[in-house]
Amino acid sequence: FISHMATTTNFEGGSFGRKFSISRENGTENKEGVPHFFEWIKEIPQEKGNRKFETRKGKDGNFRNYELFRAIDGHLIDIEVQTKDFSGKPEEWLVLKLADGEEDYQIELGQIDGRYSMDTMKRLLDPSFNPNQKVRLSPYALKNDSGSWNIGVSIMNGTDTKLSAKRESEWLTDIPEATKIVFNGE
């Protein structure tokens, strides 16, 4: 069930249309919040309807507004590795570019060896992936009974093809494990 999907709005997204990143809903207070695609917006509209919004305080002390989406769909038109500078340290990030009619989306999946990026690339290697069909992306984070997390991006391709990322799939036998990173002691 997809509760909120990115569609055309009146907000400007920069040089490549609209730009999204993955973060957890209420993630500054709840480290186990539901992952969403976050899109920066100038201000939260008066009429919210069923849309989700969140305001976060940045490191510089300024507040930033975001609209949250559970899923984004479009035709995959490019995959890039972009180098981003965080506090003087370069990081390689995986970025997907989608087109949906007149709209272009840039989706930052995080570090190239992170779980969202690795899971997405495994799914795009699925032999049933058809680049001529739309993809629908939805980030997830599921905690199992032992307390460990299964984190990734669910990808539907076309009308009913869910792309697989199972380790036992023959096309994934030699793929490396995602890097486990300790962030702020966690």
Predicted regions located by residue number:
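OB-fold ssDNA-binding interfaces and closely related basic DNA-contact patches used
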Residues: 2-109, 121-127, 142-181
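GIY-YIG-like beta-to-alpha core
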Residues: 110-118
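Short nucleic-acid-contacting surface segments enriched for D/E, G, S/T with interspersed K/R
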Residues: 117-138
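Mixed-charge, glycine-accented linear interaction segment located at domain edges/termini
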Residues: 185-186
